[in-house]
Amino acid sequence: MKEETKVTIIIPTCSSERIPLLIQTVKSIQAGTYKNVHPVIVADGNKDIYDVASKQLNNVTVILNKKRRDWIFSINRVLKEFDSEYYIYASDDLIFPTDCIKNTMKAMQKCFPDGFGVISLGKKNKCIFGLFGNKWVNHFPNREVFCPDYIHYCSDGELLGTVKKLKKFAFPPERESQVQHFRLNDETRRLARKIRARDREIWHKREEKGYLWGIDFNLITRQ
């Protein structure tokens, strides 16, 4: 039997309210048929999450942002600090069906055997909760796959535009086995909403300039 390659699964989380969901998310990953998984939880400015996850979960890595830095920073931090052949960017309110990662890896090996592409784990035609290879990560400066102009919103949408333009985007054929996303109206979502207008303004400015992260590497906030 061919040895499974490692998949690092990045899970940012900021609200203690979601600890039960976070634990459920990780356990659904570990219960899957694809076993060579490495969940990395980013406790985003929340020491309580760091302590609870470290004590209650096995075979995971938990890291702490000393202050809240939000989604884009947290995902990019793991991409910079953890070596892996493949990565999945996820969230703390998902359920991974049993064969989800296995089927997604099969699709990756069929569509992009060198890992230079994104396979969606979401059920909608959006670049959300995707699997990509280390070669894809190395395409980006400082391994920042998610455009650092943004804080929380819009970066995955811009990534969708990039992978479609490059023809490096695919779905597994087994769409029914992709992740379930709860999309709760809770503290995490309320915190994110505070910067939604800011991120959308950046999105429009980048569109006006014709910027597309991954096609080019232009930034507005660092000019």
Indicate residue ranges for each PLM-predicted region:
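A short, glycine-/small-residue-rich helix N-cap motif at loop->alpha-helix starts
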Residues: K66-F73, L79, F129, I151-Y153
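Conserved donor NDP-sugar-binding/catalytic core segment of glycosyltransferases
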Residues: T98-F129
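C-terminal catalytic/acceptor-binding lobe
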Residues: Y153-Q223
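Short, acidic, metal-binding catalytic loop of nucleotide-sugar glycosyltransferases
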Residues: Q24-N36
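A conserved acidic beta->alpha catalytic loop
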Residues: I41-D51, L94-I95
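Short beta-strand/loop segment that forms part of the nucleotide-sugar
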Residues: N36-N46, I63-N65
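Short beta-strand-to-loop acidic/aromatic patch adjacent to the donor-nucleotide binding site
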Residues: E85-I95
